[in-house]
UniProtKB/Swiss-Prot annotation:
Similarity comment text for this entry: Belongs to the NnrE/AIBP family.
Recorded superkingdom: Bacteria
UniProt protein name: NAD(P)H-hydrate epimerase
EC number: 5.1.99.6
Keyword Membrane: no
Catalytic activity reported: (6R)-NADHX = (6S)-NADHX; (6R)-NADPHX = (6S)-NADPHX
């Protein structure tokens, strides 16, 4: 079976950590390659960086895209103060490359947005400020690449978080890492996820099977679906 539950993804991440495998640089590279395959160098890219590791992924992508000649702006509404260790290193690399961050969206729409606000771990409704930011991004009607899951969408249910439901990022593409939660394949999630892609981050089927154990082994099916 495929890696299709959030807890399976977490199990893979834990094994990678124990083995000393840094997945964030791989995720950021996969995102940067995805954008570069669809947008010419010199175009304006807006990277939305949240307060967790999803934000770290997008910061790695931002640094790589800037090095490739893209005009990259980073918006980090919560700032860098509480970033986890790996994401903090990604932030430091972005700053070392001359990058800066703003708390607010720019006045004009970019050519493409990378959504790295919240990942598969988000289980609470979006607050008012986050919702306002997402509404503005959606109103731009520009291509959006969501990393892991569109921010504001539950990876467990495939439905918008909140009661009443909020309004997630409406992605053109969703690039999942390691596995695609089954809920994101449900018909109701498609309107938010757009086209769905999977990157295994260079992890082998044997590694995935070891991580999730005999109750949820990943097979070569996942490998055949990998890559942006």
């Amino acid at each position: 079976m495929d890696i299709e539950r959030v807890e399976q993804v977490r199990a893979v991440e834990r094994l990678a950590h124990r083995r000393g495998l840094a997945l964030m640089p791989r995720a950021g590279l996969a995102a940067a390659d995805f954008v570069a395959a669809r947008l010419p160098a010199g175009a304006q890219v807006l990277a939305l960086a949240g307060p967790g590791n999803n934000g770290g992924d997008v910061l790695v992508a931002a640094t790589l895209l800037q090095a490739r000649g893209y005009r990259v702006a980073v918006v980090m509404p919560a700032g860098p103060a509480r970033l986890p260790d790996d994401a903090r290193r990604a932030w430091q690399d972005w700053c070392a490359a001359g990058g800066q961050a703003s708390a607010d969206l720019p006045a004009h729409a970019p050519a493409l947005v990378i959504d790295g606000l919240f990942g598969i771990g988000l289980a609470r409704p979006l607050g008012g400020a986050w919702q306002g930011l997402i509404d503005q991004v959606n109103a731009w009607r520009v291509p959006v690449l969501a990393l892991d899951v569109p921010s504001g969408l539950s990876a467990a249910s495939g439905q918008p978080l909140g009661d009443p439901p909020g309004r997630p990022v409406r992605a053109t593409w969703t690039l999942s890492f390691i596995g695609v939660p089954a809920a994101l394949r449900a018909p109701g999630a498609a309107a938010w996820c757009g086209e769905q892609y999977l990157s295994l981050l260079g992890l082998t089927p044997a590694f995935l099977a070891e991580a999730v154990g005999p109750c949820g082994q990943a097979t070569a099916t996942a490998a055949r679906r990998s890559g942006p």
